[in-house]
Amino acid sequence: MTEGVPSAGSALPTPAMSSLPLAALNVRVRRRLSLFLNVRAPVAADWTVLAEAMDFEYLEIQQLEKYADPTSRLLDDWQRRPGASVGRLLELLAKLGREDVLMELGPSIEEDCQKYILKQQQEASEKPLQVDSIDSSIPRINDMAGITIRDDPLGQKPEYFDAFICYCPSDIEFVHEMIRQLEQTNYRLKLCVSDRDVLPGTCVWSIASELIEKRCRRMVVVVSDXYLQSKECDFQTKFALSLSPGAHQKRLIPIKYKPMKKEFPSILRFITVCDYTNPCTQNWFWTRLAKALSMP
């Protein structure tokens, strides 16, 4: 057995194991954790109790409830916070009385930890020697830390959004209307609007990729004639589509808010459009859009 890894089914980790990041746990273990913790039971601590023990706030837990697999999302969010580790997770499960989880998943967790330690040792042996004081290629802080108004500058608590808004500057008035209808009403959605939320000084392509892939659950595309001429909008749209081929995850939502002289973009034709130009359905427009953005 690898030194520092607890024996199968043990309730508490050894001190050495406390330093292993949560990334050591693979998908199989995480899915089985979800099977145990997603179930809401009055006699056993579920994922919401674990989230409180991880110091998640009430509103953060409410946001997690939107997801089909809240335990998986909880682990993803927690592993970005300081102090998150395999050892700490096992300590919390033991403290909450979930010995059943520890006994059932102990062997699998031990196996994952062994593989992780072995991989780290192999990478360390293959890595060329670098002198930290003269190697300018070693980043001190995540390049994508502090890219939005409410971001943590150190990257420990990044800002998340319900939707990234892809739009042209000429369509900004409609974006303002979206903010009024979706953020400042009972829907209380959180939109990522570049001109309002993104700090200047970083590559626009890198920021867009980070926000669309990792910070926003959906992307709304405001389609217009000017949109078709925008290289930035074209990049954002194609990047979002690449994350969800065939729109299986309903990640991208096109909006047509005014008549167009040019053809609707072919890459978006297979996705259901929210059409603000249709007077027969305009009364339902914001409700449908808000519901689509609120889906887990």
Swiss-Prot record:
Protein localization: Cytoplasm; Nucleus
Keywords: Cytoplasm, Immunity, Inflammatory response, Innate immunity, Nucleus, Phosphoprotein, Ubl conjugation
Cystine residue pairs: none
Tissue: Detecetd in mesenteric lymph node, prescapular lymph node, lymphocytes, lung, kidney, skin and urinary bladder.
Record carries keyword Cytoplasm: yes
A cellular-component GO term for this protein: nucleus
Domain TIR, chain residue ranges per copy: 159-293
GO biological process, any: toll-like receptor 4 signaling pathway
Residue ranges of every copy of the Death domain listed in the record: 32-109
Subunit structure: Homodimer. Also forms heterodimers with TIRAP. Binds to TLR2, TLR4, IRAK1, IRAK2 and IRAK4 via their respective TIR domains. Interacts with IL18R1. Interacts with BMX, IL1RL1, IKBKE and IRF7. Interacts with LRRFIP1 and LRRFIP2; this interaction positively regulates Toll-like receptor (TLR) signaling in response to agonist. Interacts with FLII. LRRFIP1 and LRRFIP2 compete with FLII for MYD88-binding. Interacts with IRF1. Upon IL1B treatment, forms a complex with PELI1, IRAK1, IRAK4 and TRAF6; this complex recruits MAP3K7/TAK1, TAB1 and TAB2 to mediate NF-kappa-B activation.
Domain notes: The intermediate domain (ID) is required for the phosphorylation and activation of IRAK.
Described function: Adapter protein involved in the Toll-like receptor and IL-1 receptor signaling pathway in the innate immune response. Acts via IRAK1, IRAK2, IRF7 and TRAF6, leading to NF-kappa-B activation, cytokine secretion and the inflammatory response. Increases IL-8 transcription. Involved in IL-18-mediated signaling pathway. Activates IRF1 resulting in its rapid migration into the nucleus to mediate an efficient induction of IFN-beta, NOS2/INOS, and IL12A genes.
Name this protein carries in UniProt: Myeloid differentiation primary response protein MyD88
